[in-house]
Amino acid sequence: MALKSSSADGKTRSSVQIFIVFSLCCFFYILGAWQRSGFGKGDSIALEMTNSGADCNIVPSLNFETHHAGESSLVGASEAAKVKAFEPCDGRYTDYTPCQDQRRAMTFPRDSMIYRERHCAPENEKLHCLIPAPKGYVTPFSWPKSRDYVPYANAPYKALTVEKAIQNWIQYEGDVFRFPGGGTQFPQGADKYIDQLASVIPMENGTVRTALDTGCGVASWGAYLWSRNVRAMSFAPRDSHEAQVQFALERGVPAVIGVLGTIKLPYPTRAFDMAHCSRCLIPWGANDGMYLMEVDRVLRPGGYWILSGPPINWKVNYKAWQRPKEDLQEEQRKIEEAAKLLCWEKKYEHGEIAIWQKRVNDEACRSRQDDPRANFCKTDDTDDVWYKKMEACITPYPETSSSDEVAGGELQAFPDRLNAVPPRISSGSISGVTVDAYEDDNRQWKKHVKAYKRINSLLDTGRYRNIMDMNAGFGGFAAALESQKLWVMNVVPTIAEKNRLGVVYERGLIGIYHDWCEAFSTYPRTYDLIHANHLFSLYKNKCNADDILLEMDRILRPEGAVIIRDDVDTLIKVKRIIAGMRWDAKLVDHEDGPLVPEKVLIAVKQYWVTNSTSTH
């Protein structure tokens, strides 16, 4: 009897256990179904997007190909009724540059090129309309053809073909401009000129990767450096040489509107492996050598400065230059004196070319500590340059412990430096940023870019040549995209919590500081693709999102693409604004799934031109 009782108890316990397991399975099944239905806390974000009309599918209806004509808007009638439609600006604004407006510039002093510096329109003068493309506008040629040919309709200015006719800058042929690769200092072409420089400067082994071209003209120097895997940041003012920077960008060469005047250059300290001036008309010896001191600030230890043209070899050329030899002699004396004060070593002088090299550290420059002319900059942050006045002072080298140590850290040759840990990271120069955090950021951007390519298969095919990252961070987006087919302008906002542009340059990438509450220093329609990572969250309560989006529209080419990554609530607001901007747009889930609150907004700008009342 006892045995039978024990057996019955065991069966009862087994039945209870089975019931408990079954009940738990049912509970979790019901819980999962409840969450998936849209009423669970975990999917409240997805529900919000559904209720707001957001579409998180993989943008099957967006067309990234170029057709020179846009498609009808994707915004439904009910949604369109709620959005503000931005009207086209008048046709006279096709090449409007808000912070380098010619009429406004003429109200400022001409001393030290102040009138050519950035002078942005006050709030009551801002244009709240869409900048039109000129009639006949077409998508630029693909690289490398774009290096040599630009459609006339895109930049219809023939002034340079007359002014620079004998210098072989640019020629007008039928419906295109042709760029023969010549220049004032390139009588045998830019390639031959660069060959001469390369006999002194190591351009072929990745040691020299980033370059600065001051007063770049149409940027032929930067264009022909491309095949040597050197990336030049070129700048020139918006002046009587109409559209020179616009031509550079139409050719697919990195360039911005800029000038050496009274304000520091918008680049970090120790950014460039070499700097270049070919008849750039900058008075290098003036203001106690202040302009050379600014070049020294942005030049890496061991970097090179090239001066081509007056006053080099003035004894032979003063008659051809139609300048008094006494003036040229004095100009060169001041340059040599400033270079000596900076402790640069003259490496080469032949014909009209001279090359100096900056020392790798200040071990050989101790004697200048006692020179009364050597005024050292007192600032603790040499990268704090936005709208800061230039000073006639020498930027100190970072400290070193031996005579052969490179101040600030030695960089690997490119392409190894692209993914190596930059010295600014490994040395702990950026507070709160560790090597692990940097490497994790790289992994994340490789993952993000892989997802972008699934959405837009044309991303790395050459369809998009000029790309901008509006909030670049460490340059992870650009590094993941790195290719001979494209380049990325890495913009670090001046209000960013951490200044990472120095890291961008240490990776062998290029970029610039900018405040997106103002217009960028470029012409309209100069970028094929714009990427904005958490930019609108960053500028929340700082300035109007409408103004930022209108600026994006100004600098984006017709049929260009936009990728905006941000929190979903921010993107819903952005999507509502761009519904009135002649963009086609879709919201896409994060690559890790719909429950991630970060989403991606993909957009394509429609094709339309001046005097058009609707898209073609």
Curated annotation (Swiss-Prot):
Annotated glycosylation sites: 205, 611
Keywords per UniProt: Glycoprotein, Golgi apparatus, Membrane, Methyltransferase, Signal-anchor, Transferase, Transmembrane, Transmembrane helix
Protein's GO biological process: methylation
One Pfam family cited in the UniProt record for this chain: Methyltransf_29
Lineage top rank: taxon: Eukaryota
Intracellular or extracellular location(s): Golgi apparatus membrane
Membrane-spanning intervals of the chain: 14-34
GO annotation, cellular component aspect: endosome; Golgi apparatus; Golgi medial cisterna; Golgi membrane; nucleus; trans-Golgi network
Gene Ontology MF term list: methyltransferase activity
Major subcellular site: Golgi
Membrane protein topology class: Single-pass type II membrane protein
EC number assigned by the record: 2.1.1.-
Side of membrane Cytoplasmic, spans: 1-13
Enzyme class: transferase
Segments on the Lumenal side according to the record's topology features: 35-616
PANTHER family: METHYLTRANSFERASE PMT2-RELATED, SAM-DEPENDENT METHYLTRANSFERASE
Other information: Co-expressed with the galacturonosyltransferases GAUT1 and GAUT9.
Protein name (record): Probable methyltransferase PMT2
